[in-house]
């Protein structure tokens, strides 16, 4: 564990496929993906299945279906850091989607994953941390004076987060962000000219 005052640095290479690439990925999913990431509970909620079909009625590709569900959740379910207990005998996710209309990240992610799976699109939950708070260059941690690089963020336990990932053949797992209090993902439509090989 990290003690107060301690810091560590993480560097990562992020894959940010274009919308064009995701739309063109198709549906030739490997068996190891479909065996595990299309599973649904027995007697899964018919109202949630119907909602998934309604939301994605005009979506032509798995990417467009995932994006439509993401947008629906961001627009129709208000973020709340706490959720009361659902009425006895009620499916909690159904209650959140159709009555309570408030959720936090785990419920946003669960709703998107389960709706995608009802459509035959492999999806899974990822957990970790959101971006945290940006630090201004030259600003230190906990009052210390030290040089901080641009694009440095402070991440705390309240930044714990969950989000759905969707599988695209030839691309792999791609994150989506349905949680209403998080910034939407910025995914390029097509490769920029300066991204092409020289």
What are the roles of these predicted feature ranges?
Residues 71, 106-195:
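Hydrophobic/aromatic-rich core segments of domains that either
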Residues 97-107:
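Active-site loop and adjoining helix of the penicillin-binding protein/serine DD-peptidase-beta-lactamase fold
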Residues 1-99:
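Acidic low-complexity segments
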